[in-house]
């Protein structure tokens, strides 16, 4: 369970980073 929790935290971190990059990229496109 602990390992799963750590993996989920890592996944969540990566997902947020990816989402931020996508938002930044689309912002640059529409600027």
UniProtKB/Swiss-Prot annotation:
The gene is SPTBN1. Interacts with ANK2. Interacts with CPNE4 (via VWFA domain). Like erythrocyte spectrin, the spectrin-like proteins are capable to form dimers which can further associate to tetramers. Associates with the gamma-tubulin complex in brain, but not in kidney, liver, sperm, or uterus. Interacts with CAMSAP1. Can form heterodimers with SPTAN1. The keyword Membrane applies. Fodrin, which seems to be involved in secretion, interacts with calmodulin in a calcium-dependent manner and is thus candidate for the calcium-dependent movement of the cytoskeleton at the membrane. Plays a critical role in central nervous system development and function. GO terms for molecular function: actin binding; calmodulin binding; structural constituent of cytoskeleton. It is found in: Cytoplasm, Cytoskeleton; Cytoplasm, Myofibril, Sarcomere, M line; Cytoplasm, Cytosol; Cell membrane. The keyword Phosphoprotein applies. GO terms for cellular component: cytoplasm; cytoskeleton; cytosol; M band; nucleolus; plasma membrane. Belongs to the spectrin family. Spectrin repeats lie at residues 1-10, 11-19, 20-31. This is Spectrin beta chain, non-erythrocytic 1. The modification Phosphotyrosine is found at residue 27. Keywords: Actin capping, Actin-binding, Calmodulin-binding, Cell membrane, Cytoplasm, Cytoskeleton, Membrane, Phosphoprotein, Repeat. Its main location: cytoplasm. GO terms for biological process: actin cytoskeleton organization; actin filament capping; central nervous system development; central nervous system formation.
């Amino acid at each position: 369970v602990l390992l799963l929790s750590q993996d989920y935290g890592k996944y969540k971190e990566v997902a947020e980073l990816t989402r931020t990059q996508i938002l930044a990229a689309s912002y640059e496109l529409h600027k």
